[in-house]
């Protein structure tokens, strides 16, 4: 594996890469609060299997550029960055894989540019269609009220200074975040995504939160160093563009994912509390869905918690394209 700096039309991207330069291209899109290194096991496995694997630090993260304006983090920018990355390699096709926030990016790559992204695989977050009644933050508030679990964290993240709590103690914030969504964390200590009154995404996590079993100190130090240097404003600006995304994607209302697709989620992933309802209808929205897996015992950080199973899932999907 190697770390590259690739200049695209919109920005300079830091990319973890492996595999023959002429191998079939696979782009891996991380989520929050992660980096391209969250795909290290997959980049290695794909490279060894003959694929050209690229895992960028996404816009606003790590070694990739961080625009200042909130409105520069829309889904159109994020998909555009992946289009530019593919083009920078002299390619006209790629498979896109996404996890967490990277899953909606991957789904929208396939939705908006099926000519370029010939297949899509997503982890943790199923495709969620645009709901005409939006905007999303209002629907999320209604969901919070209906479930009675407290305020939804994405609504809390809309605050212009929400990132400051993370930046005040980067190591502590990351430790709590990884712990709260990990499959090994006891049920009564894992997050639901909804915060009791008077708490935040971070303060609701127990103070004695530890690193997940799969997260070594050296690996954790990489995250801490990257987010200490970059801050988390850009990362949270992704969330602050959710309503703007809803406005910008009106032209894609009711459009389906037509390329081959695959989806995997851990059965202990807290995202299922608020997005799991979309798993049942995934085949209707992605008619060429070829594999849908619920991985027993796995939490949210599935490609790092259970790398061997995720590698087998991806390689199996790719081999049948």
Positions of the model-derived regions?
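Short, hydrophobic alpha-helix immediately C-terminal to the catalytic nucleophile
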Residues: 40, 107-111, 311
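Conserved HGGG/HGGXW glycine-rich cap/lid loop of the alpha/beta-hydrolase fold
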Residues: 17-65
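Glycine-rich phosphate-binding loop signature in dinucleotide/nucleotide-binding domains
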Residues: 20-21, 89-92, 321
